[in-house]
Amino acid sequence: APAVGGVLISVIPVKMFAAINIASFLISAFGELFLIFNAAKTTSFKEQAEKKTYSAFLWLLRNKDFRPFLFGDGLINFCVTSGISVAVPFIITNALGISSGSYGIITGCLGFGSVLSALFQTKHPCKTELKYPYVKVGSLGFIMLLIGLIARIPYHHIFTVIAFCILEFIVGWLSVAINIKTITTIQIFVQDDLRGQVIGTLTAVSYSLIPISLLLAGTAVDMVESYVIPLICGSLLVVLLGCIRLLDLRANKLPTE
């Protein structure tokens, strides 16, 4: 798949890829509105589903331990989608002129890192503590900053390809590690009657920001230099993550009733 994507990205404009992704997410979200499970058992299934989703959202907002997961996951999806998913293909194929074959190898490193991270997590599970992975998420922000800086240095084919391979590998590794940490934390620390709604609410909030991010990034690539996008997204992720961390520390210092 990465190799095929590398060939297609050199033929099809990035904006078209963004449009396809936006359409797919909107169709998926629209289709989920009509999913019905055992609807015959209740006369107001839709109302109950809406109330459960609203209750889970309020629970996440009010729970100081899980609030960082709500804001952090949405922030990750928004920044990574623009700074990596859209900007990196454009930088590699258009700005730097790297071949589609090399782009396929670079993208393959992303998948390779994801697979190895998943295998590593099965052998070495993360600690079962109620704590948001600030370091891992912040590392994604710094990687986006590095991507923007590498795109600005004098181009050298071998160095650039190796650098992007390493960075994409780390992105794949961190993305899976963060996702596993989030799901594991919810499964362990959220009560049974809320667990499904909490996972669904986090997913809905995070994924709803992806089309917006794709639209903004797809528009920005024609307005600014491509390296600017990961620099902005990386800075935004690091700064806002720091704000979330400060609010988290402040909330934990407040007396509880």
Residue ranges and their predicted role:
Residues 1-6, 10, 86, 118, ...:
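Glycine/proline-centered helix-kink
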Residues 3, 69, 86-87, 177-181:
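Transmembrane alpha-helix boundary/hinge residues in polytopic small-molecule transporters
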Residues 11-19, 58-118:
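A single, central transmembrane helix in multi-pass transporters
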Residues 18-48, 246-257:
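Helix-loop junctions on the cytosolic side of multi-pass membrane transporters
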